[in-house]
């Protein structure tokens, strides 16, 4: 009998009823919510006279709509209504939350792990497509729609069809100047944004083993850009050490770890598809187009037009085949988002700007992903490094990742961004987004254009 993957083991643990190949009813261990996808779900509960079945397994935070300057000055009517409504709903339904402006508030996919609520073995959902981030801990985690949010509120369960399994093995040692963001951007560039459709993606290999938990979260975060709702990794000592001592960690921690150690893929586990990437051959990545697969290694020319999507992307981005990343005239730099706004990301970026100043006519902002990260960074003096270099140092939130709050890239301006999506108008109407690592974004801020971080003294 073939061995089981970590996903198989967790699926079996949470299966309540249902036949294979059909929707199956799954138990949910942790439900994260934010202000955008929860209001209608709460209203549905009220209309039906229902309560939240397990408020103790539900946690809310404010992230998408919150301003990162003057955080209480919310001028957009819809944004203010959503924030006010979540404040009302968590109070009415008795749900623990990181209140707007509180010392815990931040992006949901950062606050969850920081509180210790994200743990190996859990089945986690949230009304947000980047919920796969939590899979880095050895959890099943994926985004759901608002009607499903209401279903989880009412029943603590969700109907799901078990996906196929894909194994992506990252092997080898990356060159200096190549980071986990480059791993996932390279994967998407090689195989496309639909390669993971219908699959859960398990990321493994010695290159994954050597990453920190924060670096692992970056990879799982962008599973959805690879086409998969779910990304997962096997937990190890780094995982246990990250969770230990946090408020939400299990009280009997040693017993929990003993259980978690059984939740790893068997050596003979079977997968429907296997991809292997040698990271020693990778280079810093930069996207040129309007989906994350439209990316190249630094120094490579942008590809020839292959179809209408390429033609439209080039027209929107005001670029052309044969150009290179270093040819792009940047106007904005954004270091933040649930992909790359953790403390280690800010530390990395700060190395490239310390003692320097951003290029003229450039706007650069740093948005820590949570209040704890901001406080920790300030204790280390990172805020001063960034501000002395001409960056704006902001309060936590989703910020410029998406145009749902005051932080937007102006029409027609090119932005080097550490976020996860480069769709048309994603960062504001007419914004031209180039996805990259925090190192590439920080170095670009100083030079005014993309440069090869592998050649800079900061990586030597």
UniProtKB/Swiss-Prot annotation:
Species this chain originates from: Streptococcus sanguinis (strain SK36)
Alphabetical keyword list: 4Fe-4S, Amino-acid biosynthesis, Branched-chain amino acid biosynthesis, Iron, Iron-sulfur, Leucine biosynthesis, Lyase, Metal-binding
GO molecular function, one term: 3-isopropylmalate dehydratase activity
Listed NCBIfam families: leuC (TIGR00170), PRK05478.1 (NF004016), PRK12466.1 (NF009116)
Keyword Nucleotide-binding: no
EC number: 4.2.1.33
Protein known as: 3-isopropylmalate dehydratase large subunit
Matching PROSITE patterns: ACONITASE_1 (PS00450), ACONITASE_2 (PS01244)
Role noted for this protein: Catalyzes the isomerization between 2-isopropylmalate and 3-isopropylmalate, via the formation of 2-isopropylmaleate.
